[in-house]
Amino acid sequence: MNYEKLISDVNLAFAGNQFEVSLKKAQEAINKDDSKAEGYVCAGKAALSLGSAEMAEHYFKTATEKDKNNGNIFFLLGYAQAMSGHSSKTVQSLTRALESNCDTSVKGQIYKMISMINTEQGDYGNALTNLSQAEDYIGLDYEILQQRAVCLLLCSAGLYPHDKRTFKRCGRCRVCLPELTCRGSRQNRLCGNTC
C-alpha cells in the first residue's frame, strides 16, 4: 500500500473515532516514508485522542523536525505539552507556532492557552493581555469571559498563588482557580463548582 493511501486510511479511521486503527495506520505510513511530517502528525493526533499526551508529544516533536516552518505542527506540539503538564515547553512551542505563521484560526487558541498558563503562574496582567489577543482572533466566547473574570477578581482581591500546589484548573468549568475551600469541603468559592 502506498503512502498516500495509508494517510487516507488514517484520516478515515480518525474521522470514525477509531483511534487505535488510525495510530496503527499512521505508524505504517511512517515506516513507508519517514521523511514526511504528515505521518507523524497523524500519529500524534491519534495518540492524543487515545489519551497518550507523552506519545503525541514525541510524534509532534519529530514532525517539527521534518517540517521546521509549519506553525500548525508547533501548535499541536504545544497542545500535547500542555496536556503533559510542561508549561514552559508549551509556551515555547506556541510562540514558535505564532512565529511560523500558523493558521489564523489557531492563533486565538494559542493566546487562550498561553493566558491559562499565565493564570496558573499568577501572572494575571499577561493573562489578560493574552485573552484580549485571543478575542481579536476568535471573538468573545464563554471561556474567555470566565478566564477574564477570574483574572480580574484575583487581581482586585490580591489573591496570588504563592504555592503552585494549591492552584489547579477547575474540573467543571476548566478555568484556572486557586484552590480555596470552605469548611473542609472541596467546593471552590470563586466558581461554586466542586473540583
Language-model features, listed with the residues they occupy:
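Helix-start (N-cap) detector for alpha-helical repeat units in TPR-like alpha-solenoids
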Residues: N2-E4, A37-E38, G71-N72, T104-G108, ...
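Canonical tetratricopeptide repeat
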Residues: C42, L76, I110-M113, Q147, ...
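Single-residue signature of alpha-solenoid repeat helices
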Residues: S22, A56, T90, A127, ...
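Register position in tetratricopeptide repeats
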Residues: A15-G16, S49-S52, M83-S84, M116-E120, ...
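Structural marker of alpha-solenoid helical repeat scaffolds
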Residues: K32, K66, S100-D103, Y137, ...
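Alpha-helical segment of the N-proximal tetratricopeptide repeat
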Residues: N2-E38, C42, L48-S49
